[in-house]
């Protein structure tokens, strides 16, 4: 049920761009500040740390406002696992786009320090 990587990547980048454009104006600078990395699935290092192989996305690094010596050693970024998202969407392009959007917003929420309820209150989910 796989699709060519270039196709998955193009769809995901387009959907993330579209999602960022639709964010409230006060959140757009934050979206510009956190890079998005696109990978097929979690790598061996993440799996060794106990993450599930079917993980859809994750935020690494510290949320906005956390800047101390004991903070995360990783730079802030959102990871989207495109083949997992495609499989989760059962190979349906429109569903894939929607799952990319939902996963991006969910991980962006972690970057902002927001939980699911707060994202819903803001109308983002």
Predicted regions and their residues:
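Active-site rim/adjacent substrate-binding subdomains
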Residues: 1-99, 111, 117-120
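Short hydrophobic/aromatic patches at helix-to-coil boundaries
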Residues: 121-125
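Short alpha-helical catalytic segment bearing the HExxH-like zincin motif
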Residues: 99-107
